[in-house]
Every structure is written in structure tokens, then in C-alpha cells.
């Protein structure tokens, strides 16, 4: 405890606790080993007589490259004296170094039987121990510490990635990497790194060179894209007098340059079918800055289909663009990449539309896809065409094996899940790529879409085709700005013999058979969306017979029939026919448009998937995510719960939550009434920490997404 006692006395006296280092690791070795290293008999005799109770001396084990001692010391050197004083133990060595910070010392060594006397500067250990960090794009970096430098066996300089966050993970720069260059300029410390970031505007790119501990001798180059939209850029330093880490904002950077216009040529293919569809296919990448709506993975890519050349509309599945907040890029022919934006998410099905600026691709000869809306049947020949992750086109002839209801398990994280749709299965289908199914003329007969599914603790994806009639209706609805009308119920197909067992009379059985003589089925309600009018008027188990007097026996027939504000639903319930007028729900495709971070928890209004899958009332605010180490973690404000009261004040929505919490001070306690998805109530108390976990809101505006702080 010698050095601890010394540090305590210095602190009690109000003096700085100096720490010196040679950036060298020493080991204590026995005389037997020392003799093999070249310790002379005279030096051993002097050491044994001076310290008769000791059995060895100190030997250099490692010297940090680039340090002041690197040109003087070498592994295997035996330490004899410092400034004429014989040193053979760690405590006297530390005592000398702590008292000589910034000074030159005389050091005497033996190396292979030769005596070496030299001078070396004692470095300040505090100067190479991080006491500040830089935060940008949700990433946290600090100067490479002396302790990490020992592991890397490199100089204690460069920028260590403590947390890659959103921005660096987007650039595939991992945790533990050491950044050594930005755009060809060396980066030795945080000042260098901050200066490099200050020159970057929002969205501007820079080349980053880094090394990893796994392969420190080989550097890797990645492209970093600066973010000034989703997260602040700031630098925080330890204040020894208070123990806090106050922060200052970095420079805002220059204004963004107008996007450059580029053009590329498209590859020609020998197969005329592939050649017809290839100009309509692109790669879409999506990066998610926040964990919201049950979606936690941050980076996605998939094949997009150009459905409107004039508007720049591109159709993708919702396993490529799962929610409405994030960064989108569109890549043409593996050569030209442009920025995109999210236009609409289909509120019911596995589709989204993103857009690019048609002017940004110059004369690139893209084409708008044409569609064949005739339903595919088992035995039909199709060509599967999509783009792989390496931007190479894959095309394969296949045959439709079946068209079946797509029944996906309920999402474990309450993310979007498709329902009331039929999926097309193929013979020997390619599962490593998504894209389209085209006929021999190159017309799109169906998409070949990727569906995310969660079963138990595992997540997987499933590829199925979806008929182009669903796509064309979606595109037309988005073009005209119309809402999507939904009955807000989930259905399954019931064979007519099952409908008979439910008591459906012969007249209706005959009408159902006449409507669909091939498949002979009826629609039965299996789940209702909580909070909807249908949840009050319909019941699970109802057999739906007709909409507005027209018999419906398929998902598509029913969905088309309810595209109006109000319908009359004819159902069979309890051995009788009932005609029930119901107002349909008008859904838009905007998706989420605001979220709040509070006490380290990410909050949002309850999204539709909660009501549709688990029957959760759309009341309160939903905890989408919590950050480790935050008050939300310490006090048990877990993800998946809803906050319905704050200090006994009802919280119907996100705005009510903001109003109820904005005046709560730092370190004040607050009572929260929370509910789990199954209705379990728990009241917790939480103490705010506005120093390290300030509250902010992310909101979509006409000018794009904006982040603003709120609270005390």
C-alpha cells in the first residue's frame, strides 16, 4: 500500500499526485535466470550484499515503441541503478519515477554482460492516460491509453474506439479499433481528430485508416460519413475538482455541398428476359440510428425495384427498410450511389417505397418496371432476378410450387409482422437474394421479398413471392396520397367443411363455393387490433361472409372491398348471420415521426404492431430501448413496457409525457406507473441524471429530422 498511502497524503494536502513512467514494463526475475541473461558476478554480489533478503532483480519485459525509453531500453535489460541508486524492487522504482516527471534520469543497465549507462526522460503517466473523450454520431472515442498501447505494442497515440455507436458501425469500424489517419493526415490525439471532424459537413465522407488488436501490423481503410443530424458532436473532459465530465460542442462544420450529379452505364445480358428487368433493379441500403418500434438491428440492404421513374420511387421490402426513421442510399449498377429518403411504409404489408432525386443520376438509363397482375399459379414458370450483396445480378429460372397463406409467428420484440397475405413458394428457390419474379417478357409478376420472423429467441428471414397486384395498388395509393383503409382484423382461411361445423347454413356455403369453386374456403377472424372499432364490434371466430353484400373468400378480395371509410360486414356468429356496419381505420404510411430519450430510455407512442399482435391498447408511451448504465437501467424502466402515469398524472401519449416531465430537475425522483404487454402493472421510482442522460426529442419536420433538447 506504499504508493496508495503516498497518493492519499498528497490528496489530503491538496497537492497533485504525480505519476512517472518510462512506458516500460519490468519483471522481477530470480538470480538464476538473471545469470543466464548476462548478469555479471560483480553486479550480483553488490545486489545480494545490498539487499540480502531479496532473491532477484528487475528486468525489462516490454518497451512501448515511440516512447522516450525506446531508444535506450530493450527487453532482457537488467536494471542496476537510477541516478546512482541501486534499484531492485518495484516500490523504489515507482518512487523515483513519480518524483522525476518530465526530468532526465541516469539509468544503468546490464545487457548480455555489457554495462550500459544512459539518460532517459521520465514521462507523465497522467498525460498518456485518457481524461477526456469525444462523442460524435453515437460513437465514443478517446486517445489510445498507455495500458491499451501495451496490448497493441505500439506508441500511445492514435484514437481508440471505445464504442462504435451508429456512425462508426455504419462504416464497419469495430469496437477496439485504433484510428491512425483521416484523409491521409496522421491522427495522434483528440486535438488532431477534432480538427479533422470540424472540416466535415453533414453527410460528407472521409477516408479513415485504422488498426485492430487482432492484426496490429496491417491497417484497414474505411469510408466514414459524418453525421450531424441524429447525434451531437461534443468533447468531454474530466474536471478533477468536481468529478464531473463537462462537455462542449464541436464546431458545426461547413454547410453541406449540393449533391453531385453522376451517371453510369448499365450492363447488357444475353438473356432477353433478364435484360428487360435489369435496368429497373437497384440496391437499397438503410441505416437505423435509433432502436424503435421493435427494430434493433442497425444496418440493412436489399434489392429495390424502380416503380416510378419520374418521381424516383423505388419499392423495397420491410426487411430492407423496416421503419420510417433512418438514412437511405440507392446504388445503380454497382457504380453510382445517391442519397434516398423514405416516402411511405405499407402499414399492412411487407413493402416500403423510398425515393431518389432523378436529377442526381444524370443520364443513367434506368427503366420503370412493368407489371403482369395475373395471379401466379402452381406450375407457372418464372425467372427470379435480384442483386446480391456484392452488387452482382443473380438470375435463375424457377417454377411456382405453391401459393399459400403466409402465417408468420408473432414478433418477440413487437416489430412489424405481415398478415392477411398469400406467399408464393418456388421450386429450388434462391434464399440468398431478394428481388422480383418476372415472366418471359420481363414483366414483374411478383416480388421475391424477404420477411423477418422471430420464433422464441431466434431471428431469421424467409423469402416468399407476393403478387404484383398488391404492389400496383400500393404504388397507386402513394402516388395519389390516399390513406390505406383497414378492417383492423387478422384472418385465416377455413375450409368449407370447418365452416359447416361452425354452423354456416347451406345457402351461404353454396354462395362461398360459387365465389371460389377451386379453393372452397371462408375467412375466419383470428385476431383483432386493440382500440379499433372492429375490436368492439367483431369477435375472434367470426366467419366473414361478405362486405357490402359482396361475397369475399380471399385476403385480396376482402382488402380491396374495405378501401372505403365505412363498410357493412356480414359475419356468421353463434348460428346466425349478422350484418355489422363498421368504420374502417384510415392508416397512413408515414410510420413513426417522433421519439424521446429520457433518463436513458427511448420512448415513443405505441406503434400499430403492439395493438395488432398482442392486443395492447394504444395508450401511454412505449419504452423501445434503454441504455446500459442509465437511470432507466438502474431503476428498472425496461424495454417493452408502457408508461401510463407520471407522479399520478395520466399519460395518454408522448406529448403528455413531455409536458409532465420537462420541469423535473436533476437528481429529483419521479414515480412511474408502467404496464407490461400482458397488463401487469408495476410502479417504480426513478431518480433523474440530467448531467449524463439529458432529455431530447427527435422529430420529423418538413425540412427533415431534427433533434432538440428539453427538460431542466
What is the meaning of each model-derived region?
Residues 3-289, 296-331, 335-347, 352-366, ...:
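C-terminal recognition in membrane/secretory proteostasis and scaffolding
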Residues 2, 14, 388-391, 453-457:
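Catalytic-center loop of serine/cysteine hydrolases
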Residues 143, 382-416, 605-610:
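Chymotrypsin/trypsin-fold serine protease catalytic domain
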Amino acid at each position: 500500500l506504499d504508493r496508495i498511502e503516498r497518493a492519499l497524503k498528497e490528496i489530503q494536502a491538496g497537492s497533485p499526485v504525480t505519476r512517472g513512467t518510462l512506458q516500460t514494463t519490468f519483471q522481477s526475475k530470480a538470480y538464476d535466470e538473471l545469470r543466464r541473461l548476462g548478469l555479471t558476478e560483480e553486479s550480483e554480489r553488490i545486489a545480494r550484499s545490498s539487499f540480502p533478503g531479496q532473491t532477484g532483480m528487475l528486468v525489462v519485459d516490454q518497451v512501448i515503441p515511440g516512447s522516450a525509453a525506446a531508444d535506450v531500453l530493450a527487453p532482457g535489460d537488467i536494471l542496476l541503478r537510477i541516478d546512482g541508486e541501486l534499484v531492485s524492487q518495484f516500490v523504489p522504482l515507482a518512487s523515483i519515477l513519480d518524483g522525476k516527471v518530465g526530468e532526465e534520469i541516469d539509468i544503468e543497465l546490464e545487457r548480455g554482460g555489457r554495462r550500459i549507462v544512459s539518460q532517459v526522460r521520465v514521462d507523465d503517466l497522467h498525460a498518456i492516460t485518457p481524461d477526456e473523450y469525444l462523442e460524435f454520431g453515437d460513437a465514443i472515442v478517446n486517445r489510445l491509453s498507455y495500458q491499451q498501447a501495451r496490448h497493441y505494442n505500439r506508441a500511445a497515440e492514435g484514437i481508440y474506439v471505445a464504442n462504435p455507436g451508429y456512425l462508426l458501425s455504419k462504416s464497419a469500424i469495430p469496437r477496439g479499433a485504433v484510428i491512425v489517419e483521416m484523409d491521409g493526415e496522421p491522427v495522434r490525439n483528440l486535438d488532431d481528430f477534432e480538427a479533422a471532424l470540424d472540416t466535415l459537413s453533414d453527410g460528407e465522407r472521409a477516408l479513415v485508416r485504422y488498426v485492430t488488436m487482432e492484426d496490429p501490423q496491417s491497417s484497414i481503410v474505411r469510408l466514414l460519413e459524418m453525421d450531424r443530424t441524429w447525434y451531437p458532436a461534443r468533447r468531454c473532459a474530466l474536471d478533477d475538482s468536481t468529478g464531473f465530465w463537462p462537455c462542449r460542442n464541436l464546431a458545426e462544420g461547413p454547410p453541406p455541398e449540393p449533391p453531385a450529379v453522376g451517371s453510369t452505364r448499365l450492363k447488357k445480358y444475353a438473356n432477353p428476359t433478364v435484360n428487360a428487368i435489369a435496368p429497373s433493379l437497384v440496391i437499397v441500403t438503410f441505416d437505423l440510428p435509433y432502436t424503435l418500434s421493435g427494430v434493433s438491428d442497425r444496418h440493412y440492404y436489399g434489392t429495390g425495384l424502380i416503380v416510378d421513374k419520374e418521381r424516383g420511387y423505388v419499392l423495397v421490402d420491410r426487411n430492407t427498410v423496416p421503419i420510417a426513421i433512418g438514412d437511405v442510399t440507392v446504388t445503380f449498377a454497382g457504380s453510382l450511389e445517391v442519397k434516398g429518403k423514405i416516402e411511405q411504409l405499407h402499414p399492412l404489408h411487407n413493402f416500403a417505397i423510398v425515393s431518389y432525386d432523378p436529377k442526381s443520376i444524370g443520364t443513367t438509363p434506368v427503366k420503370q418496371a412493368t407489371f403482369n397482375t395475373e395471379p401466379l399459379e402452381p406450375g407457372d414458370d418464372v425467372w427470379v432476378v435480384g442483386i446480391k450483396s456484392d452488387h452482382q445480378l443473380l438470375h435463375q429460372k424457377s417454377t411456382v410450387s405453391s401459393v399459400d397463406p403466409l402465417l408468420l409467428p408473432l414478433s418477440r420484440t413487437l416489430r412489424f409482422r405481415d398478415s392477411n397475405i398469400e406467399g408464393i413458394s418456388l421450386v429450388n428457390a434462391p434464399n440468398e437474394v431478394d428481388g422480383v419474379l418476372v415472366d418471359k417478357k420481363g414483366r414483374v409478376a411478383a416480388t421475391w421479398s424477404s420477411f423477418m420472423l422471430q420464433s422464441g429467441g431466434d431471428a431469421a428471414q424467409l423469402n416468399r413471392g407476393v403478387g404484383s397486384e398488391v404492389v400496383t395498388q400500393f404504388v397507386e395509393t402513394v402516388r395519389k396520397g390516399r390513406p390505406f383503409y383497414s378492417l383492423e382484423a387478422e384472418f385465416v382461411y377455413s375450409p368449407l367443411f370447418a365452416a359447416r361445423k361452425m354452423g354456416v347454413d347451406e345457402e351461404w356455403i353454396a354462395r362461398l363455393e360459387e365465389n371460389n369453386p377451386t379453393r372452397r374456403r371462408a375467412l375466419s377472424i383470428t385476431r383483432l387490433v386493440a382500440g379499433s372499432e372492429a375490436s368492439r364490434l367483431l369477435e375472434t371466430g367470426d366467419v366473414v361472409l361478405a362486405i357490402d353484400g359482396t361475397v369475399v373468400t380471399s385476403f385480396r378480395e376482402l382488402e380491396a372491398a374495405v378501401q372505403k371509410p365505412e363498410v357493412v360486414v356480414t359475419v356468421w356468429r353463434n348460428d346466425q348471420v349478422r350484418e355489422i356496419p363498421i368504420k374502417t381505420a384510415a392508416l397512413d404510411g408515414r410510420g413513426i415521426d417522433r421519439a424521446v430519450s429520457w433518463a436513458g430510455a427511448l420512448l415513443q407512442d405505441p406503434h400499430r404492431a403492439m395493438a395488432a399482435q398482442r392486443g395492447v391498447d394504444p395508450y401511454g408511451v412505449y419504452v423501445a430501448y434503454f441504455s446500459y448504465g442509465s437511470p432507466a437501467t438502474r431503476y428498472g424502466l425496461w424495454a417493452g413496457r408502457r408508461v401510463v402515469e407520471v407522479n399520478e398524472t395520466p399519460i395518454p401519449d408522448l406529448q403528455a409525457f413531455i409536458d409532465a416531465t420537462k420541469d423535473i430537475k436533476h437528481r429529483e425522483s419521479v414515480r412511474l406507473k408502467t404496464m407490461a404487454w400482458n397488463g401487469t402493472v408495476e410502479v417504480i421510482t426513478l431518480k433523474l441524471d440530467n448531467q449524463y442522460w439529458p432529455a431530447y426529442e427527435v422529430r420529423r419536420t418538413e425540412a427533415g429530422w431534427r433533434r432538440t433538447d428539453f427538460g431542466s
